[in-house]
Amino acid sequence: MPEPLLTLAGVNTHIGNYHILQGVDFSVPRGELTMLLGRNGAGKTTTLRTILGLWRASAGSIHLEQADITQSDTPSIASMGIAYVPESMGIFAGLSVQENLALAARAGALDDRRLERIFTFFPALKKFWFLPAGLLSGGQKQMLAISRAIVEPRKLVLIDEPTKGLAPSIINNLIEALLELKKSGTTILMVEQNFHAARSLGDGVAVMDSGRIVHTGRMADLAADEGLQTRLLGLSLDAHQ
C-alpha cells in the first residue's frame, strides 16, 4: 500500500457543547481514493471540515505528509494543496462556468494548461462555458464544483457526497470522471452515501459511527461482505442493485 499522504490520530472535535469526533484514527494513502462512509450523523462532514481547519480539533493530530496541520487555519491548509468540494458545491450561481473557474485559478488565469486539465476530466463543461452556473443541472453543477477544486494541481481533494440527489445515469457519468481523476494520481477523500458509487470508486475505506472510526480496510473487501455492510452501514440487499 502507498505511504499515507494524510494521517488523523486521536482527533476530537467539539462544536459548542457537542463532542462530535471522538478519537478519529485513519490515514489516506497517496494516490488513492479513500471512501469515508457511515450513517447520517456519524461525523463524516465534520471530519472533512476539521481536516480543512473550518473546525478546530480539540485533541489529537492531523498530518499532511510530515506537516502538522492540526491547528493551522483554512487559508494556510488550502495553500498546502488541499481542496474541498462541500455538499453545497460552493459555486457562484450568477457567474458563468468560465468565471467560476477563473475565480478558482491562481491570479484568475485560465491558461491552456489549466483548461486542458479541466476538460480532460469534464469535457462536457465546454458546452456550457458562458452559461450562468445557476442554470446548470445538478450533475453539471457538481462537475463544475469539482473542476473548481482541481483547476490547480492538488495534493488532496476532499469531496462531500457528490452524487447526492443525482439521477443514476448522471451518477454513472460522474463516476467515470472521478475514475479518470483518480488515474491521474490525485489523492481523494470522499464522503458518500451511495454504495454503488463507493464500491465503484473506492480503494480504501474508513467507516464512522457516532464520531468514531469503527472499520478501516479495502473497499473491495467491504463490497464483497454483505454481512459486514449490514452491520456497519445498515445496508439491505436492495442497496446492491
Which residues make up each language-model segment?
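Catalytic Walker B motif of ABC-type/P-loop ATPase nucleotide-binding domains
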Residues: 157-161
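Conserved ABC ATPase signature
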Residues: 132-136
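A short, proline-enriched helix->beta-strand linker immediately N-terminal to the Walker B motif
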Residues: 151-155
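The feature captures the beta-strand-to-loop junction immediately N-terminal to the Walker
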Residues: 37-39
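Helix-to-loop junction immediately C-terminal to a conserved catalytic motif
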Residues: 52
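Conserved ABC transporter NBD signature motif
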Residues: 60-68, 80, 113-114, 120
